[in-house]
Amino acid sequence: MRKKIYCLLLVLCLLLQLALPVSASTMGDMESYGVRLIQYYLHHQEKATDVIWDITRQMKELDPKQGAVWEKIMFDWSWINSDMPVYEDTIPTDLPTDDSLCIVVMGFGLNADGSIRPELKDRLKVALSFAMQYPNAHVLVTGGQTGAVDGVTEAGQMAAWLQQNGLAKTRIILEPQSLSTTANAVNSYKLLTRAYPKVDSIALVTSDYHIAQSCAMFAAVSNYQSGYKGGKSLELVGNAVCDTGLTENSLVTQAWGMSLIMGIPFDEKAKAPELYHVDIPVEVYVEPTETEAPTAEETQEALFTPEPETVEVQSKWKAIEKWVLLIAGLVALAIFWIIMPKKPKKRNRREKPKMNWDV
């Protein structure tokens, strides 16, 4: 009887595992795919476009929701580093004019005495011009304590400077906790989505060499929260930068931040993965004609978009496979129950054995 109970529990565990939308092995596979995506882009950038499309396609087969999130993250990351327009010492003119827009000003390390450094002041000058051009927009200043004076934060010093130079206090939002670009993105997203529900678009202000990293982190946080957690999407609609003459744009730092946001490991010293050939279906990628050449964004979007019918068929087969395994488990349990030998009846201890008197 005990063996039957153990067998029944084993089959029930199997059925419970089949009923779960994503198994532990699937989660492990998704993490492995995510690590590969980041490493491929880190080492090969746009040369890995076909490979990235192939990996996100495989991820969608395992879990359509998670695969779609990664697809959007990789598309945005690539676009930010290759095709995103950067406004240097000028302000974009086509952004929302109401209070749905928030201008996010990235902090910069303070002096030991808590005073503002010249580069941060340059960022603030650009932010002030931005805010004057969009008088209904909120202005979020983000940055924690980086000087030696307790309680003096980048955000607090930035807010004070903006007020001293004519910006109304009611327009300023303080985020005084963050000590890294990734934390800037995470904490700013939380603050805006929880306390300012009308805000649905953001524009970033920082230094020229820092804009790609900042935009990549903010886009990744928004995609992760809206795609995985069902949160609100904050669209990145513009930027403005101060000119420093520096060209530093560390993809390693971006990859580390991306991994941190997505909750996957990152090995800076990992060997560069080798590119491989991918046959892109004709339905997915069509050669541009001479008369109507698509933009870089349209081309990348086509590469990252598999055929809808293919995804639908794959989902149906996965459902059929689950039911086949379920029925097979029940049949195996029934067969085991039938063929399992029964224990012989125990003799009643009170019943005395019959004596043979024929001697």
Q: Language-model features: where?
A:
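A structural signal for short, hydrophobic/glycine-enriched beta-strand patches
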Residues: 25-262, 292-298
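Bacterial N-terminal signal peptides
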Residues: 9-17
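Cytoplasmic C-terminal tails of single-pass
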Residues: 345-359
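Positively charged n-region of N-terminal signal peptides that target proteins for export
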Residues: 1-5
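Sec-dependent signal peptide cleavage junction
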Residues: 18-26, 315
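C-terminal low-complexity, Ser/Thr- and acidic/Pro-rich disordered "stalk" regions positioned immediately N-terminal
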Residues: 289-318
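Glycine-rich flexible loop motifs, especially short His-Gly-Gly/GGXG/HXGH segments used as catalytic or interaction
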Residues: 249-290
